[in-house]
From Swiss-Prot:
Transit peptide, UniProt annotation: 1-70
Organism: Hordeum vulgare
Entry-linked InterPro entries: Glyco_trans_1, GS/SS, Starch_synth_cat_dom
Identification of the protein by name: Granule-bound starch synthase 1, chloroplastic/amyloplastic
Effect of residue 61 to N: In strain: cv. Iyatoma Mochi, cv. Mochimugi-D, cv. Shikoku Hadaka 84, cv. Waxy Oderbrucker and cv. SB 85750
Lineage per the UniProt record: Eukaryota, Viridiplantae, Streptophyta, Embryophyta, Tracheophyta
Amino acid sequence: MAALATSQLATSGTVLGVTDRFRRPGFQGLRPRNPADAALGMRTIGASAAPKQSRKAHRGSRRCLSVVVSATGSGMNLVFVGAEMAPWSKTGGLGDVLGGLPPAMAANGHRVMVVSPRYDQYKDAWDTSVISEIKVADEYERVRFFHCYKRGVDRVFIDHPWFLEKVRGKTKEKIYGPDAGTDYEDNQQRFSLLCQAALEAPRILNLNNNPYFSGPYGEDVVFVCNDWHTGLLACYLKSNYQSNGIYRTAKVAFCIHNISYQGRFSFDDFAQLNLPDRFKSSFDFIDGYDKPVEGRKINWMKAGILQADKVLTVSPYYAEELISGEARGCELDNIMRLTGITGIVNGMDVSEWDPTKDKFLAVNYDITTALEAKALNKEALQAEVGLPVDRKVPLVAFIGRLEEQKGPDVMIAAIPEILKEEDVQIILLGTGKKKFEKLLKSMEEKFPGKVRAVVRFNAPLAHQMMAGADLLAVTSRFEPCGLIQLQGMRYGTPCVCASTGGLVDTIVEGKTGFHMGRLSVDCNVVEPADVKKVATTLKRAVKVVGTPAYQEMVKNCMIQDLSWKGPAKNWEDVLLELGVEGSEPGIVGEEIAPLAMENVAAP
């Protein structure tokens, strides 16, 4: 598996980071408390004395969930910032990355914090009693910082009514709007608040849970920003802090998880961001769409890319796609060709997805027992969803968010073509846009003995499908990395996938799955050529099920190391290139996964 690659335009003066002309100081105007804070205008209340962070003298404590194998340095201070953080909040791959990568970095000896909104009254997060007042638009907003220490990571939650009062009950899609595809009108204010609060957290939170570190993180920090919601952080870092001699060597890495969501707003809204005018050019953007307004706009992701010191994304092939042209770079391809972009394949949570211990399976298994156990799990799955129980009938699973990116409409259009020629069963699982939910149910009504559609969130069924299905269909129009195919391989289920993004980097034709070719990125139409690709490839794969070649594919899938260990090392190598003062290589460590879910959110 290709784990790390760099895509870069071969032109004079272009490097992976951002050239010095984009690294500009600025001004800031938040409410001052004392002369020291006046430079920031940030008011902090209730924080205990915050000495410089130090490494604790004893390394023998077993309070953290990692084992040190050999030490090679003192590591880095890493602060990940994102709108999602699994399992507390998640709508897709962004939440999974911020849930899984930080513990792997901590296991390698780095001090790691993740900052995300407090969308719910999480049972395991405690009020630090630290309060800050932050200027957003024309008003000062008071935020509190909640904290828990899990799997070697400081999890920090920003508490404010803009987050907590909008998201009642289970978070799901309500992080960004009341319904799938609908945004809250104040998302700019919400995520401006997140960015500014995240910059305060390492300086003012006196955290002492880690057996190896104590006190605040200090100012020698690498901020790892994720997607458009954090696009302002580098701007605020330069204008509010570095121009005043604070965070002098701190750097920002900006990771793109999905280029299709960019944070485009009216150009007039720039004035509400409280940034110097010299940042305007980084936000300035014109496209051919009339939403949210026609004509000139600001683009948060564009600014995040230009103002960052390093730009990354979640797979090497997706990095190549992003700079290939407007269609797949979503009109930011020219910007990324300027800055350069590095792709690192994601890992997955191998403790949550483990066929040897999975409590949802009828029969647990490993690579030595997979073939018989998968047949038994198939029979249990067929019975569970109401399909005829027959282990000899090939079973195809489709699991995904029901939105254009995942191509549920393409999959649905291909089903009649598949069933005309093949004796096969298909189970469809997903929630999302109502039009796609109706499409799924229509297939079940049309083919009652062959198709089952489950249009609700059902985690146990997802696990059962991974174990019981013969093939996993992934019909994404684009897929930055993809998690579903990693989960499938973990359970010995070959993937039949579109040839895009991380699917290219992780699925090997004839070894761990089947490639159907690249599908059109036009989300407004279902191309007949794409339907043919899906149907033809699935029919080809179905014919392989049950053969010695298929049995070999099952084994090939299960021998893969899909954990975060390898990606974490690649991330370390890239972040060390930033040269933040005091940063050193970490240690060679191994995280010990918790035996049970530690972090349970209140419903």
